[in-house]
Regions:
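Hydrophobic alpha-helical segments and helix pairs
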Residues: 90-138
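Catalytic cores of Mg2+-dependent Asp-rich isoprenoid enzymes
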Residues: 1-89, 105, 128-137, 150-159, ...
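Catalytic palm subdomain of template-directed nucleic-acid polymerases
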Residues: 140-143
Length: 278
């Protein structure tokens, strides 16, 4: 990689690490050849997530995702333009990825622009599987995880996203990050979510409990999921459990309590050790 290419790649990696700071610690427990691959894939997913969830203008988002579709299609055929795809497709492991999954990845990102309200948590997770199922399949191929665990790994990704999206609940986003049955159970309305009242606190606490249960089950079912995914899920679970015991659980989720660096080091070491034994 030339200095120019390295600088371009590093700028995307920095954006990914800013959003996923635990991955800098996780990288210490990866084999040297897997570190760059992890950064390239993580940065690619981050770019697509930003287009799918972070851009307000639909046309701009769709153009960006379609550009990535063409880039990944060309990269799979040996022609690359973007520094992320240049690094990723230079890795021999990438040849193990089914070419159709690159297209499914972009289709899933486009589908996220049209996610609506879901009746219950399973339906909500199902909506996000359009993106995170291909993400998990690709990650599984890149890091030699059992393909049978890809479905469960996709749930780890989806729950992580829903926890992140919950931080914007008070803004009453168009893509509601909680299911409708939760609103009915707590006798509240979508617009009332903007108010820091006891009903909202109980709703968020209830939702965190359901997400935590889903995450615990998924972690138990996918003991050989990629290290990066399991560590992130462990940290998410700790945050959910701590926030659920707070007087204002939404505020606790937004604040992301300190000490995460040591928690990351602990879980990275523990999960890497467990992976080595399986």
């Amino acid at each position: 990689m030339s200095d120019v290419q390295h600088g371009a790649f590093a700028s995307f990696e920095e954006k990914w690490l800013a959003a996923n700071p635990e991955q800098a610690t996780v990288a210490l427990f990866l084999a040297p050849e897997a570190r760059l691959r992890s950064a390239a894939f993580g940065s690619l997913v981050h770019e697509l997530e930003q287009a799918a969830f972070g851009l307000s203008e639909a046309q701009v988002a769709e153009v960006k995702i379609q550009w990535w579709r063409q880039e990944l299609l060309a990269a799979a055929s040996g022609s690359v333009r973007h520094p992320l795809s240049a690094v990723l497709f230079a890795d021999p492991k990438t040849a193990q990825v089914d070419a159709a999954d690159w297209m499914a990845l972009c289709d899933g990102a486009l589908a996220m622009r049209h996610v609506g309200a879901a009746s219950d948590l399973e339906s909500l997770l199902g909506e996000y599987s359009a993106l995170y199922a291909p993400v998990a399949r690709i990650e599984t191929a890149l890091f030699d995880a059992p393909i049978a665990g890809a479905v469960t790994s996709a749930r780890l990704w989806a729950v992580s996203h829903l926890l992140l999206a919950l931080r914007h609940l008070a803004d009453v986003p168009e893509r509601l990050p909680v299911p409708l049955d939760l609103l009915a159970r707590h006798e509240t309305t979508r617009s009332a979510l903007a108010e820091a009242v006891p009903k909202r606190a109980e709703l968020v606490r209830d939702h965190l409990g359901r997400l935590a249960s889903t995450l615990q089950n998924a972690l138990a079912e996918a003991p050989r999921a990629p290290l990066a995914r399991r560590v992130r899920s462990r940290l998410d679970l700790a945050l959910m459990q701590n926030a659920a015991h707070s007087a204002d659980p939404l505020r606790a989720v937004v604040a992301q309590p300190g000490g995460a660096r040591w928690k990351t080091l602990w879980w990275s070491w523990r999960e890497a050790r467990a992976s080595a034994r399986t």
